[in-house]
UniProtKB/Swiss-Prot annotation:
Metabolic or biological pathway, per its Swiss-Prot or TrEMBL entry: Cofactor biosynthesis; FMN biosynthesis; FMN from riboflavin (ATP route): step 1/1
One GO cellular component term: mitochondrion
Family that this chain belongs to: Belongs to the flavokinase family.
Protein name as it appears in the record: Riboflavin kinase
Biased composition (Pro residues): 1-11
Length: 210
């Protein structure tokens, strides 16, 4: 079960990703269990877990992470003007993801479920609000079969079981806010916005290599 203590607002050192991050994952977007969008209202892009052990260090295992993603522009949904970049380069967007079995649903097979968030220049749809309206998570049109490149930059938390679906959704909402706040720090935001650092530039080039 999820501990009752408050969640930290950011994770990872302010100086930037530390080993073993950044970690690269890629693959075509495949159909998942069909629950993220329909039951939870949280659209996810799933990619195959094949070869995961080769790139993901054993000490990390299952859990929730944050990072940045790019989709092959040849088959991805057209980006909004706020997400677009110069030329034909694929937009790089923030993301939160889970790798594991989702104890609430008692999954028997491991999955990689990626929720692509809106650009950090836009208001956060998952920000806390005093209004009691249902949170509306960021949604893109379906893009099954599109190649996705993901750069994992940090770890958020382990997997938990939950007493209710509402508790699960609320924790995912907080995950999105933690990911957003973590990525807004200068040493992480450069992976979205770019700079002159050769290491970061190389990672951004890989993200857009389709």
């Amino acid at each position: 079960m999820r501990p009752s203590n408050p969640r930290p607002p950011v994770t990872g050192p302010d100086s930037g990703p530390e080993a073993p991050f950044p970690i690269r994952l890629s693959g075509p977007v495949i159909k998942g269990f069909g629950r993220g969008s329909k039951e939870l209202g949280i659209p996810t892009a799933n990619i195959p877990v094949d070869g995961l052990e080769e790139v993901l260090p054993k000490e990390l295992g299952v859990g929730v992470y944050y990072g940045v993603v790019a989709l092959d522009p040849a088959t991805a949904p057209a980006p909004s003007s706020s997400d677009s970049t110069s030329g034909d380069a694929a937009p790089i967007l923030p993301a939160v993801l889970s790798i594991g079995y989702n104890p609430y649903y008692k999954n028997k097979t491991r999955s990689i479920e990626i929720h692509i968030m809106p650009s950090l220049t836009l208001p956060s749809p998952t920000a806390p609000s005093e209004e009691k309206e249902k949170v509306k998570f960021h949604k893109l049109p379906d893009f099954y079969g599109t190649k996705l490149n993901l750069l994992m930059l940090g770890y958020i938390r382990p997997e938990y079981d939950y007493v209710s679906m509402e508790a699960l959704v609320e924790d995912i909402r907080i995950d999105c806010e933690v990911a957003r706040a973590s990525l807004l720090r200068p040493a992480y935001r450069v992976y979205l916005d770019g700079n002159e650092d050769e290491t970061v530039s190389a990672q951004r080039d890989w993200l857009r290599s389709f």
